[in-house]
Design a protein with these regions (language model features):
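C-terminal motif of bacterial Sec signal peptides marking the signal peptidase cleavage site
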Residues: 18-21
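Bacterial signal peptide processing site
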Residues: 23-26
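Bacterial N-terminal signal peptides that target proteins for export
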Residues: 1-9
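A surface/extracellular/periplasmic glyco- and lipid-processing/surface-interacting theme
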Residues: 29-74, 81-361
Length: 361
C-alpha cells in the first residue's frame, strides 16, 4: 500500500500540471445534453431531485430492500466499533422501490451528494448529521418525525431494524414537510453546470457525481483479470465482490462470502463500476465518529474485469475529477456504481485478486 500511495501522490502532481497547462476554458467546452447525474446514462427523470436513503448493513441485517435497483450505492465506516451503513441513491422519488431497513442519517453521504440536490431519507441521525442539515437548511424525511405516515414495519413498530419506505409513501408526506421533489434554482451549486433558464423555461439539471460517458476509449488498465474484490473497512466490517463475465458486472457479497440479495426480488446486487477511494480521516470531537477529507486522494476503479489505479480530487463540472496512473483525466464507463470511502485510520484495506488468487495490488 505504501507503493500505491507514492504512486497516487505522483499521479496527483502530474494531474495538477496537466490541469494547469491543458484544461479547456469554459467558453471552449462543447455544450452537452444533461445525463443522469448518478449513472451518466440517458436522463429519464429530468428536473427531479435524487433520493438518498441510508440503510442498515450490520451482519445481523439479513433483509435489505432496494439494493439491486439503486443507481448508486455508497459505503463507508462512519463511526468506530459500529457497522457500516449503505446509502442507496435513486434518480427521483418516483424511482424509489421499497427500501430498507432505514437507518440513521450520515452527513458524510449528504456532503458527497450535495451537488446533486439530494433529498435525504433517514431514521434519526447523530449530532453531526443534524448540524449539517440545519446549517444548510436541508430537510430530510425522517422516520422519527413522520412515523407510519411514510414508513412501515411488518412486525411490531418497535422492531427498529425493519422499518422501510417507498417512493409512493415518501410522496405522501413531502407536502406536509414543505419538501419539493423537484430541482430548485436556488440550490443549484454550480450555475455553469445547470441547464436552467428561467426565461426559456428549460428544466434544471445538476452536475454529475462522477465523470462518465456511454462510449469512448479507455486508457490501458493497470491490471486485467480482476475477479475478486474485498473492501475491509475494519476487523468487523467488509464487503466483497466477484466478477461475473456473462453480465460484465461485479456481484456484491457479505463479509462472510454469502450473496448480498435484494429482498424485493431475490436478486444479487451487482454493479458496472466499483470505485474505492482512499481518504484521510480523523476522529471527531465525540471520539467515535469519523470525518473524511473530501478534497483529494488515491483509489482504484474496476470495470469489466479490469483495474485502474487512480487519483481523485474535487471537480467543477462533476463532483469528482479522476485521473489515471499517468496523470491523465479519466472518464468512467456509464452505469450503476458502488463507491466506497476507505480510511487509513482504522486499518482499512483493499484486496483485489485475479482468477488464480494472485493479489493485484
Amino acid at each position: 500500500m505504501k507503493r500505491f500511495w507514492m504512486r497516487a501522490l505522483l499521479c496527483f502532481a502530474l494531474s495538477a500540471a496537466l490541469l494547469t497547462g491543458c484544461a479547456l476554458s469554459p467558453s471552449s467546452q462543447p455544450a452537452e445534453s444533461p445525463t443522469d447525474p448518478l449513472t451518466g446514462q440517458e436522463l429519464v427523470w429530468p428536473g427531479q431531485r435524487p433520493v438518498a436513503i441510508t440503510i442498515d448493513n450490520a451482519a445481523a441485517s439479513t433483509t435489505q430492500w432496494g439494493l439491486s435497483t439503486a443507481s448508486l450505492v455508497l459505503e463507508a465506516l462512519t463511526a468506530q466499533q459500529q457497522a457500516t451503513r449503505l446509502c442507496l441513491v435513486y434518480p427521483a422519488v418516483g424511482a424509489v422501490p421499497q427500501v430498507g431497513p432505514v437507518s440513521a442519517g450520515q452527513d458524510l453521504y449528504w456532503r458527497l451528494l450535495v451537488g446533486q440536490q439530494v433529498l435525504p431519507v433517514q431514521r434519526g441521525g447523530g449530532q453531526f448529521d443534524q448540524n449539517y442539515l440545519d446549517y444548510y437548511s436541508l430537510r430530510a424525511v425522517d422516520a422519527l418525525e413522520v412515523g407510519t405516515n411514510a414508513f412501515s414495519c411488518e412486525t411490531d413498530w418497535q422492531n427498529v431494524p425493519l422499518w422501510h419506505t417507498s417512493g409512493a409513501a415518501l410522496s405522501g408526506v413531502l407536502g406536509s414537510l414543505n419538501i419539493s421533489p423537484a430541482l430548485t434554482e436556488s440550490r443549484v451549486t454550480d450555475t455553469s453546470s445547470s441547464s436552467s433558464d428561467s426565461e426559456s423555461g428549460t428544466l434544471l439539471s445538476v452536475p454529475n457525481l462522477l465523470p462518465m460517458q456511454e462510449n469512448g476509449k479507455l486508457p490501458d488498465a493497470d491490471a486485467s483479470d480482476a475477479m475478486s474484490v474485498r473492501v475491509q473497512f475494519d476487523a468487523q466490517n467488509a464487503t466483497g465482490f466477484s466478477y461475473d463475465a456473462d453480465s460484465k458486472t461485479y456481484r456484491m457479497l457479505h463479509a462472510d462470502g454469502t450473496l448480498q440479495l435484494d429482498a424485493n426480488n431475490g436478486q444479487q446486487t451487482d454493479f458496472d463500476n466499483l470505485l474505492i477511494l482512499f481518504s484521510a480521516s480523523t476522529l471527531r470531537d465525540d471520539g467515535v465518529t469519523l470525518d473524511y477529507d473530501l478534497t483529494m486522494g488515491g483509489g482504484v476503479w474496476l470495470n469489466e474485469g479490469h483495474l485502474w489505479n487512480i487519483t481523485w480530487t474535487q471537480g467543477s463540472e462533476t463532483t469528482f475529477f479522476l485521473y489515471d496512473s499517468n496523470g491523465r483525466p479519466l472518464t468512467l464507463t456509464a452505469g450503476r456504481s458502488y463507491l466506497a470511502l476507505v480510511s487509513s485510520l482504522t486499518g482499512q484495506e483493499l484486496t483485489v485478486q485475479n482468477s488464480t488468487g494472485e493479489n493485484l495490488l
